[in-house]
Swiss-Prot record:
Residues spanned by motif DEAD box: 230-233
Binding site for ATP: 123-130
GO cellular component, one term: nuclear pore cytoplasmic filaments
EC number(s) recorded for this UniProt protein: 3.6.4.13
Cystines in this chain: none
Protein name (record): ATP-dependent RNA helicase dbp5
C-alpha cells in the first residue's frame, strides 16, 4: 500500500451607476516579500478545477516528425489500452475515472512511450492533467526492492505548498494499491523538522525547498527518472520560482524525462518551456468556448469600504449554508476582517502567505473537513485548490492587476475566473458575489462583464429579505448556469 512520508508538515444605498462617489484610495498590493499589505499569489492564469471546456480540441505537435499518427497509441479512448499495471487501473477506478479526458487521450500515450520523451502541455485545472502526470510517474517508478522504494525516482514541482499537498493526495489515492510506494513532501517548514534523508519513491514539493534539500544531500537525485513542473505560468509570475526550477533541473540526471504543464503560453512561457523541456512533444488546447457551469454571478453595491464590511457581516448567515471563501486583496485586509468578525462573535478563519506553514496546513484541513465554514484569504487560494463543499465565493475586493506607474485600475480577468471557480464544483450549484464600493471598482466590474461577454446580476441591498431569497433560491436550485461567451 502507498504511504506518505510526513517529511514536512506538509449595504446599503442605491445603484452605484446612479450616483457619483469619490474613489477610495486603491488597495493595490505591495510586492516586497514581508509587507503586511502583500497580495498573496501571482495573477492566476485562466482556468480552474471545474471550469469545463465542452468544445475544445487538443492539437499535438510531435518532436519526432516521423512519428506515426495512425499508431494505436497516438490517442487512446480507454485506460486499459495503455497496458497499465492493474493496480494503477484499480487506483484510477477508486478515483472514479472511467475513461480518459481529452487531454489524457493525447498526453498519456506520449508520456508513457519508450524511450521516454519530454512533454510540454497546455492544460487548465479540471482537464485531468494532474492525473496524467501522476499516472506517468507511478508507471515509471521501480518498487521491486525496499531500497528502491526509499529512493526518489519521480519529482513533481508545484508553485505553492497547498497545491503540492493536493498533488500528494492524488498520488496517494491513485497509487494506494501499489505495495511499497512511499510519497515524500518537500515544502517549506521548520528546518529543524527536516529528516536527515528523504526516503520516498515519489517526491512532491516547491522549488526552493527541493533545491535546498538536494544541496544538503537530504534528497539524493541521481535515480530520478521523471521531473514534472506543474503550472509553469504561475511559477514564472512569482518572483524567482522559474529560476529556481532551472537550478533544480541542473542538479538532476541529464536523461530525466521532463514534463511541463501550463494553463497559458504567452511568449515568455513558451521560451521558458523550450529551454526547460527541450525537444518535447507539445499539446495545446484549441478553445472554442469556455463555460462555467453551476455558478450564479451577482454583485452588491456598497457606499464605501466600511459599508463593504457591514454588508459582509449581514451576509454571514448565508455564508454558513455550505462553505464560503472571502477573497481580499491584501494580507492586512484579511487579518483586519477576521479580527473584527471574531470579536463580534462570528466563526471565521483567515489563510494568507504570511501565516506559519504548519498553521496554514491546519486551517485548510479544517476547511476541507467542514470544521471551518468561512475562510478569508488572498490569491494564495485562488488557484487549483479543490474543496467540494464551497457554495459561495465573495470578491470582497475585485481582483486587479498590479501595474506600477499606471493610474487606471485594471481588473484581473484570469484571477476572477479562478476565484469564482472555487464554487459550483463537481456539479453542485454555487454563487459568486462581488462587492463594488466606488467608481473604479464599478469600472473593473464592467471590464469583467465585457471581457467574458456575460452579465453579472445586481442585487439591491435595500431589501435584505430579497437578497437572502435570491441567494437561497440559487443555492437550492439543481443547477444555476452562467456562460461566458466565445473568446
Amino acid at each position: 500500500m502507498a504511504s506518505e512520508q510526513p517529511v514536512e508538515a506538509a449595504p446599503l444605498g442605491g445603484s452605484l451607476s446612479d450616483r457619483i462617489s469619490k474613489p477610495d484610495e486603491p488597495t493595490a498590493s505591495e510586492t516586497p516579500e514581508q509587507t503586511s499589505d502583500q497580495a498573496d499569489g501571482a495573477s492566476a492564469p485562466l482556468g480552474g478545477s471545474d471550469l469545463r471546456e465542452p468544445e475544445y480540441n487538443v492539437e499535438v505537435k510531435l518532436s519526432d516528425l516521423q512519428a506515426d499518427p495512425n499508431n494505436p497509441l497516438y490517442s487512446v479512448k480507454n485506460f486499459e489500452d495503455l497496458g497499465l499495471d492493474p493496480r494503477i487501473l484499480k487506483g484510477l477506478s477508486a478515483m472514479n475515472f472511467r475513461k480518459p479526458s481529452k487531454i489524457q487521450e493525447r498526453a498519456l500515450p506520449l508520456l508513457l512511450g519508450n524511450p521516454p520523451k519530454n512533454l510540454v502541455g497546455q492544460s487548465q485545472s479540471g482537464t485531468g492533467k494532474t492525473a496524467a502526470f501522476v499516472l506517468n510517474a507511478l508507471s515509471r517508478v521501480d518498487l521491486s526492492t525496499e531500497q528502491m522504494q526509499k529512493t526518489p525516482q519521480a519529482l513533481i514541482l508545484a508553485p505553492t505548498r497547498e497545491l503540492a499537498r493536493q498533488i500528494v493526495g492524488v498520488v496517494s489515492v491513485m497509487g494506494q494499491f501499489l505495495d511499497g510506494l512511499i510519497i515524500g513532501t518537500a515544502v517549506p517548514a521548520d528546518i529543524n523538522n527536516r529528516p536527515k534523508r528523504l526516503e520516498c519513491s515519489i517526491a512532491v514539493g516547491t522549488p526552493g525547498t527541493v533545491m535546498d534539500m538536494i544541496k544538503r544531500r537530504i534528497m539524493v537525485p541521481n535515480k530520478l527518472k521523471v521531473l514534472v513542473l506543474d503550472e509553469a505560468d504561475n511559477m514564472l509570475d512569482q518572483q524567482g520560482l522559474g529560476d529556481q526550477c532551472i537550478r533544480v533541473k541542473a542538479l538532476l540526471p541529464r536523461d530525466i524525462q521532463v514534463v511541463l504543464f501550463s494553463a497559458t503560453f504567452p511568449d515568455h512561457v513558451h521560451a521558458y518551456a523550450a529551454k526547460f523541456a527541450p525537444n518535447a512533444n507539445e499539446l495545446t488546447l484549441q478553445h472554442e468556448e469556455l463555460t462555467v457551469e453551476g455558478i450564479k454571478q451577482l454583485y452588491l453595491d456598497c457606499s464605501d469600504e466600511e459599508d463593504k464590511y457591514k454588508t459582509l457581516v449581514q451576509l454571514y448567515g448565508l455564508l454558513t449554508v455550505g462553505s464560503s471563501i472571502i477573497f481580499v486583496q491584501t494580507r492586512t485586509s484579511a487579518s483586519e476582517i477576521e479580527k473584527r468578525m471574531v470579536a463580534e462573535g462570528h466563526t471565521v478563519a483567515s489563510l494568507t502567505g504570511g501565516i506559519d506553514v504548519t498553521k496554514r496546513d491546519e486551517i485548510i484541513d479544517k476547511f476541507r473537513s467542514g470544521e471551518a465554514k468561512v475562510l478569508i484569504t488572498t490569491n494564495v487560494l485562488a488557484r487549483g485548490i479543490d474543496v467540494s463543499t464551497v457554495s459561495m465565493v465573495i470578491n470582497y475586493d475585485i481582483p486587479e492587476l498590479h501595474r506600477p506607474g499606471v493610474p487606471e485600475r485594471q481588473a484581473d480577468f484570469q484571477t476572477y475566473l479562478h476565484r469564482i471557480g472555487r464554487t459550483g464544483r463537481f456539479g453542485r450549484v454555487g454563487v459568486s458575489i462581488s462587492f463594488v464600493s466606488n467608481r473604479e471598482e464599478w469600472d473593473m466590474l464592467n471590464q469583467i462583464q465585457r471581457y467574458f461577454n456575460t452579465e453579472i446580476q445586481r442585487v439591491d441591498t435595500k431589501d435584505w429579505d430579497e437578497v437572502e431569497d435570491i441567494i437561497k433560491k440559487t443555492i437550492k436550485n439543481t443547477r444555476a448556469n452562467a456562460q461566458f461567451g466565445k473568446q
